[in-house]
Structures are given as C-alpha cells and as structure tokens.
Amino acid sequence: ALVGPSGMILADGTPVQFPAHAKPVLTGPSGIVFSNGQNIQLH
C-alpha cells in the first residue's frame, strides 16, 4: 500500500480518500480509524 496525507492506494490498486481534516490515528490490517471517529474498512 502507498499512504499519503490525503489518502492511500491499496495493494490491489483501490484508492481510498481520507476524510477532510482528519488524520489516521489507528491503523491495522483490517482498517483505519481517524481522528474524527470515522473508520474505513480495508479489503
């Protein structure tokens, strides 16, 4: 995966856009939790 300040590209090529004004605070193998409480489930 490639991770940048505004999003990431997963190993399979799927782009993930991070929520505006939120930073990833917890990253694990199955998802990401952001500073605003939103979470993204990874494949």
Curated annotation (Swiss-Prot):
Entry annotated with the keyword Repeat: yes
Sequence repeat start and end residues: 1-18, 25-42
Pfam families on file: Cuticle_1
Domain of life: Eukaryota
Organism: Cancer pagurus (Rock crab)
Keywords annotated in UniProt: Cuticle, Repeat
One term of GO molecular function: structural constituent of cuticle
Tissue: Calcified shell.
Keyword Repeat found: yes
Protein name: Cuticle protein CP434
